[in-house]
Amino acid sequence: MEPIPINAPDSVRNLKLLQWVRETAELCQPDSVCWCDGSVEEYDRLCNEMVASGTFIKLSEQKRPNSYLCRSDPSDVARVEDRTFICSIRRQDAGPTNNWVAPKEMKATLNKLLAGCMKGRTMYIIPFSMGPLGSHIAHIGVEITDSPYVVTNMRIMTRMGRAVLDLLDEEAEFVPCLHSVGAPLEPGQQDVPWPCNDTKYIVHFPEERSIVSYGSGYGGNALLGKKCFALRIASSMARDEGWLAEHMLILGVESPEGEKDYVAAAFPSACGKTNFAMMIPPGEMEGWKITTVGDDIAWIKQGKDGRLYAINPEYGFFGVAPGTSEKSNPNAMATLHANCIFTNVALTPDGDVWWEGMTDTPPDFLIDWQGKPWVPGCERPAAHPNARFTAPAHQCPVIDENWENPDGVPISAFIFGGRRGDTIPLVYQSANWYYGVYLAATMGSEKTAAAAGKIGDVRRDPFAMLPFCGYHMGDYFNHWLHVGRTLTDPPRIFGVNWFRKDENGKFLWPGFGENMRVLKWIIGRVHGRAAAVESPLGWMPRYESLDWRGLDGFTRDKFSTLMSVDREAWKQELFSHEELLEKLYDRLPKEFTHIRELMLSTLWRSPEHWELAPERYTAEH
C-alpha cells in the first residue's frame, strides 16, 4: 500500500509533528490530508461544503449575518463523563473521581478503533494556541480531526492556523490531540449530516500530554482544546510546573474613580457563570463597570511581583443557549449578532434561531432541534437543553481591553459558589488562604430534577473541577495550598450563594446585575476599605457595608436572614463533607482535618442561630 501523502506546507519544521501526522494518516487511512491555515477563505469554504452536505443551515443574512445552524445526532448531544478516561501510568494518580484504564490497554483498544476510521474522509490538521500567541502563559496544541464541524468551531474557539505553525520550530513542544467521529465511508457510501459512533472514548494521557477522542462530534468531546486540553491535560501540566488551570471566569471591575481590579470565579454548571462574567451593574451604581476577560477557563501563573496573573486561553464563547436572553444576559445576546455557529437550537420561519428562555412568549411555529415542526404546547423542547452557541469573544461589547494581554491580568480575588437553597450565606470572606481552599474544596450544588438522586441532595463539586481535574483530587487540593505558600500577595478568597430561599421557597436575593453590590464589597475588602463582621465562617458584610441604592425594598431583616448561620445546619454541613474527604483520604491535605475541627469548635462557641444583629458577637474590621 502506498503511503498517504501528508502534503505538509514547507513552513512546517517540527519533526515530532511531521512524524505524528504521518503515523496518524497511516493508521486512520483518510482519503486526503488538509493543513488548516485559519483563513477566512478556508472557513467560508468549509461552511459552504457543510451547507451542501446538509450539516449546516445558513441563517438569514438580515437576521444573523454569516451564521449557521447545525443539528447533531440525538445520541450525541453532551459530554460523556462515563466514557471519559484519565490514563495515568499509575491508577492512584488518576484518583477515585476519574475513570482509569492502564495506558497500554487503552492504546490497544483505541488503535483497533482508529484503524481505517477516516476512510472516505479528509483528515484536517489544526495547529492552535491556547492563549495569546507568544504568551509565556499560553501553550500550543495540534488537533487532527475528520470533522469540518470541529475545524470551523476551533477557528472561533482558538487562535489557529498558519501563525501557530510558524511558532512551532524544530524542537517546540505541543499537545497532540487526535479526534475522529468514528464513521468511515466505503466508496460510494452516502454520508449523514452528523456522523458519530455509538462507541465513544475521550481519553487523556497526562504523562504524555496527549488526547484521543473517538466516536463523538459534540463540542466538549470533539473540540479538544476546550475541557480536554485546557483543563484535564493543563491541570496536570500546572501541577508539575507550579501554576493553575481552572474552570473559572475572569472579569474586570472598574470603580467610578478609575481603579481597576480583576476577579476569577468558579461556579458549577447552572449557577450563572456566563451571566456573572458579562454582568451589567444596576443603573444606580453609576460609574461602576464590568468587563469580560473570559467566561469559562482561566490559566493562572505567578508574576515576578508575587501576584497571580491569569489569561483566558480561549478565543471564543461556547455557551449554553437556553436561558440566555436580553433580560438575563444582554451582553451575551449582543455577542451573538453575527459570525456564530448554533448547535441544536430551534429555527424560525424567517431564518433566525430561538431557544427556551430567549423570549417570554415562544413563536407560533418553529422547526425544532431535531428538524421537526414545533408549536407552543407540543410538550417537547424546541431547543435541546444543552444547545450551544459558538461566538467570537472579540464581539462581546464588554470585552476587557487586556483580554489578549500576553502577560495576563493580576487577580485580586477568587470567588467560589454553588446553588444552595439554605445554610450558605450570600457572601463571606475566608479567614486566610487555607480556609479559602477548604471552602472551595467542599463547595457544591443541590441536585436539580435533571440529575440523578433526590432533589435537594448536595453534589460536591470541588472548585467546580470535579469532571475536569486531570489527576487525583487530593493532590489538586495540596497543589492549591502549595501555590498559596509561594505567593507574597495572594488573592483574597470569598464564598457566595445567590440562591438562598425563604420559608416559602422564594429566592431571597434578586441576583443577576444586583450581584454587583456584593462584588463592590468584595473589591472593598481587597483594598482594606469595606467594613466586615467576624462570623463563625469568616468575615461578612454588615447591612451598611453594601450599596443599597435602587434596591430600597431590601430590608435589614431580609438581609439578616440571608446572612444568618444556623449552628445545627452548619454542623450537618461540615459532617456531610466527610463523604468526599474520606474518598480522598490517603492524599487529603492534613490541614483540612484541622480546619474542619476549628470550624466545628467555632460553631460550638457561637449562638444557636448566628445573625449580624447582636453586637456582642461581632468585631468590626
From Swiss-Prot:
Domain of life the protein comes from: Bacteria
One Gene Ontology cellular component annotation held by this UniProt entry: cytosol
Any one Pfam family match given in the protein's UniProt record, by short name: PEPCK_GTP
Biological processes, Gene Ontology terms: cellular response to glucose stimulus; gluconeogenesis; glycerol biosynthetic process from pyruvate; oxaloacetate metabolic process; propionate catabolic process; response to lipid; response to starvation
Gene Ontology terms, MF aspect: GTP binding; manganese ion binding; phosphoenolpyruvate carboxykinase (GTP) activity
Binding site for GTP: A270, C271, G272, K273, T274, N275, R388, R419, F512, G513, E514, N515
Positions of Mn(2+) binding: K227, H247, D296
Enzyme nomenclature, EC number: 4.1.1.32
First-tier enzyme category under EC: lyase
Subunit description: Monomer.
Family: Belongs to the phosphoenolpyruvate carboxykinase [GTP] family.
Protein name: Phosphoenolpyruvate carboxykinase [GTP]
Primary gene name: pckG
